[in-house]
């Protein structure tokens, strides 16, 4: 092995070690509850995005429509919000759901002032994609929930219960919330 190849291998090795060490240093500065909330939120957000972009967007091609009343319709599938909420009902060790300041249903309003404040903070700062915080006997995390497709925005804008009628693709609509009991 010549000197140039050895130098390349050394640089790659250093980059690999540094890239592995940075997350470990960050993890050492983060509480286990914070890490857990972030992992859960990232997973929920990924599943919702995949469901919205692949299942919902492609369903039209086969004569299936996303519908709020999907369970009673012969060619209906659940809406992305219903998908997240349905997954949340299957989980017993923590709460997973959706909240917003202008939800279609009152059950999707924030449960505490801290959740309301966190949502307002996210609305005021578009670069803030995730927040975690302690709130009483719970540790909570919020992941920004956007109108992933124009169909998401259109569905909310056209819904009779919607207090907001001007959503566009990419707008922050609320948040995916995880509530972890600390006691």
Model-derived regions, located:
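Bacterial N-terminal signal peptides
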Residues: 11-21
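Extracytoplasmic c-type cytochrome modules immediately beyond a signal peptide or single-pass transmembrane anchor
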Residues: 23-147, 161-183
């Amino acid at each position: 092995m010549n000197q140039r190849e050895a130098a390349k291998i050394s640089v790659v090795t250093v980059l690999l070690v540094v890239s592995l060490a940075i997350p470990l240093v960050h993890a050492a500065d983060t509480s286990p509850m914070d890490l857990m909330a972030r992992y859960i939120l990232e997973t929920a957000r990924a599943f919702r995005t995949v469901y919205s972009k692949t299942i919902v967007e492609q369903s039209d091609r086969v004569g299936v429509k996303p519908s709020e009343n999907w369970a009673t319709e012969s060619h209906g599938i659940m809406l992305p919000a219903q998908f997240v909420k349905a997954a949340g009902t299957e989980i017993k060790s923590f709460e997973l759901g959706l909240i917003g300041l202008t939800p279609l249903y009152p059950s999707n309003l924030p449960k505490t002032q801290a959740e309301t404040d966190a949502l307002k903070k996210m609305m005021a700062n578009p670069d803030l994609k995730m927040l975690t915080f302690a709130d009483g006997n719970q540790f909570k995390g919020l992941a920004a929930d956007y109108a992933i497709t124009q169909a998401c925005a259109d569905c909310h804008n056209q819904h009779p219960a919607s207090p907001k009628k001007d959503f566009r693709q990419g707008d922050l609509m609320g948040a995916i919330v995880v509530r972890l009991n600390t006691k």
